[in-house]
Every structure is written in structure tokens, then in C-alpha cells.
């Protein structure tokens, strides 16, 4: 079968939004080529943890590649993707050039091509994320492994926002905590929470593909006795109280439910948010404070922030 590779040149800020647009348009796979991956802060902290070829990355910006079967409606699909991307600046998301190019590829070329971007990565003092197809031996008895098979629909769990969320969980999760993961995606944050000692984790996502991916990864990590995965829109209809809520979502989505988070998390409980570009830190912090939260700590990595807030 012939497939079309749609390449979009954009910014790091727009990666999550553009990836979501491509998934919604029916992409059968998405790969992200971000030159920031070549010089991650974690390389300096943890040594040479992966080897990437600089020639495969753009000189500037981020290249997002998505794969669609060649059909009569492909041109309409691409036009729809372009229209959705062109709207992002109205949400204060900088898209860069937004240039779109199309190339024809064979199925065998793209079906495994995305795996070359995914290697074992130590993202904190505690956790290393390992793809299921690679052998990896922990360097110490205290090192915790999260095995992920993200398929071609979700990221590798090594984006700065995910890394910061996991580091925030390391700081805050207590044995026996009840936790909710809003917008779970691959399920990586729920798995981390379970491995940190949470007694129950509710993982929710609106996307049925995400629910399926998270369920698979939860089973893969043998945390299905702690983590339950379900389809839901944010915190609609969810009752508390829980000790902690974590949400790694776009800032615009986080702004939709601070009040619900304050309702569901117990008094004195925590709300960890990320997916927040640095320019949006103030508006998110203000929304959290208006809902009754107190900002306890802000984590920063590259152009992203994660916020740890405590409920009144």
C-alpha cells in the first residue's frame, strides 16, 4: 500500500496542538523531529543516554511527520489540517512557518521508521522510560522502569512536560494516595504514580485510541491492579475526593477545569499541571489561584513549565 508522509514545519510550542490535529484527522502515525532532543538538559545530568543523528533533524523549529493512506479524499484531509493549524495563532500558539510538504512512502518504510527516535531515556533520578522492543538493565536497584509501546499515535513519554510531571509526582506522591490522571494519553503518568506507591489511579482520556493505548501500557507494566483507565471528558461527572490530580494538557484545556479540580481534589490535596508554555504560566497560575489553589512550586524545562498547586 502507498502512503503519504505529511511534513509540517512548526515550533516546539505548537507540537502538542499540531500532533492532536493530525491524530484527529486520522493519521496512522506521527513522528516528531525536534532538534532540542539533541541537546536535552537531561544529557548533562545523566550522561549519554541515547544517540541521535543530527542530520535527521531540522536546523530550526520542529518537523512533525504524519502518515495517511493515499485516498481520493487526501487533498481534503490536508486542507482541513492546514485550516486547523492556521487557527492556532488565535489561541496565542505560535506556529512558525507552518509549511506543509507531502511525500509518497511505502508502508514498510513508515511502519517502523518512528522507532528510530525512541530509545531508553532516564528522565529523573528514579525513572527510565524504555521502549518494549529494546533490552535494558537498570543501573541500580532503586531505578524504576516504565516500559512503553506508544504505537504510532502517541509520544515517547520524554517530552519536557511529561518529564516535569513525573518529577513533580516523585516530589509529591505518598504511599496510599488516590490519584486522577486527566488526559492520560499513553498512560505514562498513571504508571509512574502507581510505581511511586499510589493505591489507586483513575486515568481518563476523551480519545478512545488513547484509552486503548493506556490500557495496553498499564498491563505491560503490571500496574493494572492499581490503575483503571476510562473514557471521559476532563473531570465531568467525576467525584472525589482524591489526594492528587495530574494533567499534562495544553494550557487552553487546563483553563477549562480548575474549578472542577478544586471540587474533586481534597482540601490540602495537590493539582499538578503541565503542557504549559512559559508565556502562559501567569494566566494558568491566576486561574488556579482564583479556583482556590495556592501555587507551591513551578518546575521549568526549556520553554515549558509545570505547576504544583495545593487546594485550600
From Swiss-Prot:
Provide a GO biological process annotation: methylation
Q: Does the keyword Lipid metabolism apply?
A: no
The record ties this protein, via InterPro entries, to: Ribosomal_L11_MeTrfase_PrmA (IPR050078), Ribosomal_PrmA_MeTrfase (IPR004498), SAM-dependent_MTases_sf (IPR029063)
Where does the protein principally reside? cytoplasm
Localization per Swiss-Prot or TrEMBL = Cytoplasm
List ligand-binding residues for S-adenosyl-L-methionine: 162, 183, 205, 248
Enzyme Commission number(s) of this protein: 2.1.1.-
Going by the UniProt record, its keywords in alphabetical order are: Cytoplasm, Methyltransferase, S-adenosyl-L-methionine, Transferase
Q: CDD domains from the entry?
A: AdoMet_MTases
**Disulphide connectivity of cysteines:** none
Supply the SUPFAM superfamilies for this chain: S-adenosyl-L-methionine-dependent methyltransferases
The Gene Ontology terms for molecular function here are:
protein-lysine N-methyltransferase activity
Q: What does this gene product do?
A: Methylates ribosomal protein L11.
The text of the family note is: Belongs to the methyltransferase superfamily. PrmA family.
- Protein known as: Ribosomal protein L11 methyltransferase
This protein's species is Bacillus cereus (strain G9842)
Give the source lineage, highest ranks first.
Bacteria, Bacillati, Bacillota, Bacilli, Bacillales
Amino acid at each position: 500500500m502507498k502512503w503519504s508522509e505529511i511534513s509540517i514545519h512548526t515550533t516546539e510550542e505548537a507540537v502538542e496542538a499540531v500532533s492532536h490535529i493530525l491524530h484527529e484527522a486520522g493519521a496512522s502515525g506521527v513522528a516528531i523531529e525536534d532538534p532540542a532532543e539533541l541537546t536535552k538538559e537531561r544529557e548533562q545530568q545523566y550522561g549519554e543516554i541515547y544517540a541521535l543523528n543530527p542530520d535527521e533533524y531540522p536546523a530550526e523549529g520542529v518537523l512533525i511527520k504524519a502518515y495517511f493512506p493515499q485516498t481520493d479524499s487526501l487533498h481534503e484531509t490536508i486542507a482541513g489540517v492546514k485550516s486547523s493549524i492556521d487557527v492556532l495563532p488565535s489561541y496565542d500558539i505560535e506556529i512558525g512557518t507552518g509549511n506543509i510538504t507531502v511525500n509518497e512512502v511505502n508502508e514498510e518504510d513508515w511502519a517502523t521508521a518512528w522507532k528510530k527516535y525512541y530509545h531508553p531515556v532516564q528522565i529523573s533520578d528514579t525513572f527510565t522510560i524504555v521502549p518494549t522492543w529494546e533490552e535494558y538493565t537498570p543501573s541500580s536497584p532503586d531505578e524504576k522502569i516504565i516500559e512503553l509501546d506508544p504505537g504510532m499515535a502517541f509520544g515517547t513519554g520524554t517530552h519536557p512536560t511529561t518529564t516535569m510531571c513525573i518529577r513533580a509526582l516523585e516530589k509529591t506522591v505518598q504511599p496510599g494516595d488516590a490519584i486522577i490522571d486527566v488526559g492520560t494519553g499513553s498512560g505514562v503518568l498513571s504508571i509512574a504514580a502507581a510505581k511511586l506507591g499510589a493505591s489507586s489511579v483513575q486515568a481518563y482520556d476523551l480519545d478512545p485510541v488513547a484509552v486503548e493505548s493506556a490500557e495496553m501500557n498499564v498491563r505491560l507494566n503490571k500496574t493494572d491492579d492499581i490503575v483503571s483507565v476510562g473514557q471521559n471528558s476532563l473531570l465531568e461527572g467525576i467525584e472525589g475526593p482524591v489526594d492528587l490530580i495530574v494533567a499534562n494538557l495544553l494550557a487552553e484545556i487546563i483553563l477549562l477545569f480548575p474549578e472542577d479540580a478544586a471540587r474533586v481534589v481534597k482540601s490540602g490535596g495537590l493539582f499538578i499541571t503541565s503542557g504549559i508554555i512559559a508565556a502562559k504560566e501567569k494566566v494558568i497560575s491566576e486561574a488556579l489561584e482564583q479556583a482556590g489553589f495556592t501555587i507551591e512550586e513551578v518546575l521549568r524545562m526549556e520553554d515549558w513549565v509545570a505547576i504544583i498547586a495545593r487546594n485550600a
